[in-house]
């Protein structure tokens, strides 16, 4: 049997490569609803199966857990089948958002075959995420935060903006595992967000709590104090979970930032493939857009406006400046960046010649590779010597005068009026 997975050791396991963060968090939430809890072996088998399933990503766009379950081999180890069964049931319970009816004029309706009138715009639905659900009949599992838990959560949301799908899914997963009180949620907010975001969230939360208290909440007693005070009681499980939902909903009401978002400055490189550029845009929008904001119109607009000039010309020529993303990808899939690297042409070496070299008279090498100096074509024009070039002529070298003997130099320093003594025959002066 596998070892029971410790929730406090690693609240959020790493997703497999190629799977979006909000999809991976759906799998984690479904795994944590298993009774008994998942083991490390179950997570290992889940990641192993998803790596295989990502090779045939027909179940991702849109997400279809029933189709994914059909790819699971029979008798697959672990509890992957149970996790997929929970996801299928949850996806069936979430009602799909109906498309808005097309606007019609009260006087006359235009015919459907009129090519001058464009079809009505249908707002794309936001990616479905699982709500926070606790196992049925499970006792309260409230546990206060530890520093390692807060650090792990902050590491996961470090690249995501407050209110984005990845941010919200990570927070939902943490709320599901720890079942925090109002005080715990306030500590988490101050640890993750800046003081400005925390202040705006506090204002939105106060307005939502006022509406909920006016509307009436199950098991809420106004005489026992405000909802925030009653939610701090670990025994008030129902009120605590109502407060958790209001705390999460306050992120969706945060006003947008006045500065340009980070994803607006993502540009396609001169030699970057178009599909890689669109993938970077998609990840940045997942991490930066508030939850519930339509992503497809922004993605289609940036996929054209921030592309390089060559891809923009291709999209303009085919009329896909604001087409569906699949048409834009197909239009640019044949484009390849120009390879500007120089290719060195290596010529094969010729075999050594059998004839002797005309410089040294030896065979086995070419004259350009000969180590002997090249003989002059004629005699030196200065000295008429045929053995050297003009640049090596000794007449061009400056003559260095020979130094005088030291004795002569000393004699020159003597005064001229001193007579030299003469020795006599007898040796006397």
Swiss-Prot record:
Coiled-coil intervals in this record? Answer: none
Annotated Gene3D superfamilies: 1.10.1200.30, Delta-retroviral matrix, Human Immunodeficiency Virus Type 1 Capsid Protein, Zinc finger, CCHC-type
Short sequence motif PTAP/PSAP motif: positions: 124-127
Q: Name one GO cellular component term.
A: viral nucleocapsid
GO biological process terms, semicolon-separated: viral translational frameshifting
Q: Which residues carry this modification: Phosphoserine?
A: 105
Where do the ZnF regions (CCHC-type) fall?
Answer: 355-372, 378-395
Q: Does the keyword Iron apply?
A: no
Query: What residues show lipidation of type N-myristoyl glycine?
Result: 2
| Chain positions of site Cleavage | 130-131, 344-345
Q: What is this protein called?
A: Gag polyprotein
Instruction: Identify the species of origin.
Output: Human T-cell leukemia virus 1 (strain Japan MT-2 subtype A) (HTLV-1)
